[in-house]
Amino acid sequence: LQQMRFGQRIKYICNATDECLEELVPSFVLQPLVENAIIHGLSNSSEGGLIYVRCWKKNEYMYMSVADTGLGIEHERLMKIRSTIDGVFDSDEFENNNELQDLKSNQKTVGVGLGNIAQRVKGMYDDSGMKVYSHQGCGTIIQVYFNIGK
């Protein structure tokens, strides 16, 4: 649908190893990450950009990443996002995590979609995580990983 909306302004590259295609992955992880890349990274750029979706396995872990060539995230906001996500994965009682509650009450400051994805992955896989890399003006990479061997 987004391809129809933005036409040729946004290009997609998807790369998944064969062994990834055989694994069950948490639902609604990649789709909201791609939507975030479009909405927050590329939609305001007149040139559009590229979204690169990648999936691979290393040892007992499955990795999924979504990268964009968009606007990137301002440093202060990036730090808040990272802190919130780390709070989800570091907390045994992630549903009661104070930073996650702050995230839900202040959706404009920090991306609530990323917090929801972190919760979903943490709920399914104890040994999991999420990393966000971004430089303003250079794009963003969001990587989700989880242990599929447990």
Which sequence ranges carry the predicted segments?
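Two-component histidine phosphotransfer core
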Residues: L1-K131, T140-Q143
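C-terminal beta-strand of the catalytic ATP-binding
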Residues: V144-K150
